[in-house]
Regions:
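Short, acidic, small-residue-rich periplasmic hinge/interaction motif at the N-terminus
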Residues: 23-87, 95, 125
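Extracytoplasmic beta-strand/coil segments of soluble accessory domains associated
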Residues: 95-136
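Short acidic/polar hinge/loop motifs at secondary-structure boundaries
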Residues: 135-162, 250
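A beta-strand signature from Gram-negative outer-membrane beta-barrel systems
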Residues: 149-190
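Flexible loop and strand-edge segments within Gram-negative outer membrane beta-barrel domains
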Residues: 228-249, 257-316, 322-340
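Membrane-embedded beta-barrel scaffold of Gram-negative outer-membrane proteins
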Residues: 315-329, 447, 455, 489-547
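Gram-negative outer-membrane beta-barrel transporters
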Residues: 415-418, 517-521, 541-626, 704-706
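C-terminal beta-signal and adjacent terminal beta-strands/loops
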Residues: 523, 565, 616-625, 650-707
Length: 707
């Protein structure tokens, strides 16, 4: 018996030393072969980290812990997040997956609909290209709510790249890309169930199962349901703090893998109902302000890869996707109906001439159609029970939009061992609205020694703005909604970046230190302006300057066996010209800085895990306040900094685990998330100026089962 413990101790020491040694070098990416096009051109989480196979010593299981995040190995600066990192928090959906991430912020757009967006490099998530399995996804009206459309238990990993990304996936990446890597049919066969509940009356159930039908065929099904059973108004302003929400989500995915041909395909459907507005228990009136959003979404995709030469990674791949997004929305007496359709296809050829030279060329086409009906600026209030009266219907206007954009790209990558990787790419596209446009991008990574990596990037990005669809949540405001009569131009920006990563041996372990700077310069931008007219929210083309400077430094260190800490600080300088070119000022509702500290500890046998995150979010500016009828200011010109703390404890068993935790444990809430709440039918009603949490402390518990 005594000899067993001696051997166990020796194995743990050897594992820890190996971990420190291996983490001095960066992760190794998959080669630029068919895996890039069809299976995943990001690094699989199982191959990114230093992985130690479980050693079984009679009934004692030795586990060496791997990191939950790792840096992407190529020329593009980015990180890969695997399930170990996602399990550090409840991670009910994509929007809740970045709690422990220093680079990505997630915030509510308004206090009534629950619309959320990410911010990367100090700018809104509209400038981040969203991908699922490396296919562009979630466009137009899906943007404000897309973070809730990807259940957390469905995700195998997330890859976040910063700056202009590869031209292979299109021209839309301005500040970066976020790619969601779903669970795969070809993964180890298992059934998983995840149940979740919190103190805000939210419950969730998730299930997934995959089957290997043969040595070539595999399939899986993913299921999700969530429901907020009871609305609440904790701040007493007469409005629900968060909308009621019920969602059903399902996907079926298939794989065929032969020697020279690989197929991936799948179908998905989502149904979601959101209800919000005034709390009938606290507002004693027959004239209740209500918000209702009914969404139906259907999507499908196919990926075909033909492997022509295994030795050189020569392959041809065809990838396509289609989606239909239907939205019926009511914001008080305003109605917005949408039927949005998207088709995307790309044909890719890749080959490695030698181990040093890789070429990727391809063609693509993207088509968007938005059938819209809205009564955006109706001012008369309908009588109770007359919301669907012919009078209101006569105010509905059709505003259809469509765009078709075919294009071609070429990308060359030069790799000199582990010392140098240079990637240059160009795209040429033609928009049926804006005509021809050219997209150059360049990335280089240089490692003079194994412990240092330097990355430089420069590139251009473009984006078509579907103003009403993307900003339909602004219809909740009491102001009128105005989009420039000349039409919104294509957004256009340059992005430049530099980052340096250090791997420093320290006390027998490795300190990972990263510093980066990014500059985004807009040549044209759709400006959302609250300042030009107090009675309007105006969206118009940029008249002047708009830019973002972002500096970030972060460090992580395994303080002791099983304990890893991370600290980060980010500084944002984001400015835009408002009031139709008159004033260059800070971008409203954007924090000037963010500091983050995380600690994660897993016991030696892997039975218990403790995670904690502390955030300090810096203050910033609000839109220009104005004087109300009573002589007071509509709101403060600035908002102040605030802290947030979250924590979770997980107990692991052989085939299941339980977790309990809490979010926003400091209890901080934005004091007035809804301005003018006492009169939602007036022009001073404003629920869209949210800069902080709208709910207080929340506690939760859940169970994960797999067999």
């Amino acid at each position: 018996m005594y000899s067993r413990y001696i051997l166990l101790s020796a194995l743990l020491v050897i594992g820890a030393e190996t971990y420190a040694k291996n983490n001095k070098t960066e992760v190794v990416a998959l080669s630029s072969s068919y895996n890039n096009s069809v299976e995943n051109n990001s690094v699989d989480s199982s191959s990114q980290d230093s992985i130690f196979k479980d050693e079984i010593l009679h009934e004692v299981k030795v586990v060496a812990r791997k990191s939950g995040t790792s840096r992407l190995a190529g020329a593009v600066n980015g990180i890969a997040v695997n399930k170990d990192e996602l399990f550090k928090a409840a991670c009910c959906n994509l929007g809740e997956s970045f709690t422990t991430n220093p680079s990505v912020d997630v915030a509510y757009n308004d206090a009534t609909t629950g619309a959320r967006q990410i911010k990367l490099l100090g700018l809104s998530g509209t400038y981040v290209q969203m991908l699922t399995e490396n296919l562009p996804n979630f466009r137009g009206a899906a943007i404000p709510y897309a973070l809730g459309y990807v259940p957390g238990p469905w995700m195998k990993g997330i890859q976040v790249s910063k700056g202009s990304a590869s031209v292979k996936n299109g021209y839309e990446s301005i500040t970066g890309q976020i790619n969601v890597d779903y669970l795969k049919p070809e993964d180890e066969q298992q059934v998983e169930v995840n149940l979740f509940g919190d103190t805000k009356s939210r419950i969730e159930a998730n299930a997934d199962a995959n089957v290997h039908l043969s040595d070539k065929w595999a399939t899986e099904i993913l299921l999700h349901h969530e429901n907020i059973l009871k609305n609440h108004d904790d701040n007493g302003d007469g409005f629900y703090d968060m909308p009621g929400r019920e969602q059903y989500n399902v996907q079926n995915r298939w794989l065929y893998k032969g020697k020279h041909y690989i197929f991936h395909g799948g179908l998905g459907a989502l149904k979601e109902i959101r209800t919000s507005g005034q709390d009938e228990e606290h507002v004693h009136s027959d004239d209740i302000y209500r918000i209702k959003l009914h969404t139906n979404r259907y999507e499908g995709y196919m990926k075909h890869a033909f492997i022509l030469n295994h030795e050189h990674g020569t392959n041809i791949a065809f990838m396509s996707s289609a989606s239909m997004h239907q939205l019926d929305a009511q914001y008080g007496n305003r109605f917005y109906n949408l039927n949005e359709k998207n088709l995307y296809g790309s044909l890719i050829f890749e080959t490695n001439f030698t181990h040093q030279h890789n070429l990727s060329v391809g063609l693509s086409v993207n088509h968007d159609y938005l059938g819209q009906r809205a009564n955006v600026n109706v001012s008369p209030r309908p009588a109770v029970g007359q919301e669907d009266s012919p009078y209101l219907l006569s105010e509905m206007q059709r505003m259809n939009e469509k765009e078709t954009t075919p294009g071609a790209y070429a990308q060359y990558t030069y790799t000199l061992g582990t010392k140098l990787t240079a990637m240059a790419g160009v795209r040429f596209d033609h928009s049926s609205i804006y005509g021809n446009f050219f997209t150059p991008r360049f990335h280089v990574k240089y490692s003079p020694v194994d412990a240092i990596s330097i990355r430089l990037s420069a590139g251009k990005g473009y984006r078509t703005v579907f103003g009403l669809a993307e900003y339909n949540y602004l219809l909740a405001s009491g102001r009128e909604f105005q989009i420039t009569g000349d039409g919104l131009k294509q957004e256009e920006a340059w992005n430049y970046g530099m980052s340096t990563a250090f791997y420093i041996p320290m006390f027998g372990k490795t300190l990972k230190l990263n510093a980066e700077y990014y500059y985004t310069d807009f040549k044209n931008q759709a400006v959302v302006d609250y300042d030009a007219n107090k009675g309007l929210i105006s969206i118009y083309n940029l008249m002047g300057k708009s830019y973002s400077h972002t500096f970030q430094i972060d460090a992580s260190y395994p303080l002791q066996k099983g304990l890893e800490i991370t600290a980060a600080y980010r500084l944002n300088d984001v400015k835009c010209t408002y009031d139709y070119g008159k004033t260059l000022k800070e971008k409203p509702l954007t924090s000037k800085y963010k500091a983050l500290f995380t600690a994660s500890y897993k016991t030696p046998l892997g039975l218990w895990q403790f995670d904690a995150t502390v955030q300090l979010n810096g203050g910033g500016s609000n839109p220009e306040p104005y004087q109300l009828a009573d002589g007071s200011q509509s709101w403060s010109p600035r908002f102040h900094s605030f802290e947030q703390v979250s924590a979770q404890v997980t107990r692991w068993f052989r085939h299941w685990s339980i977790y309990v935790g809490g979010e926003n444990l400091t209890g901080f809430k934005q004091k007035t998330p809804i301005y003018g709440a006492s009169n939602p039918w007036g022009s001073d009603f404003e629920p869209t100026l949210v800069w902080g949490p709208v709910e207080g402390r929340m506690f939760y518990a859940g169970v994960r089962v797999h067999f």
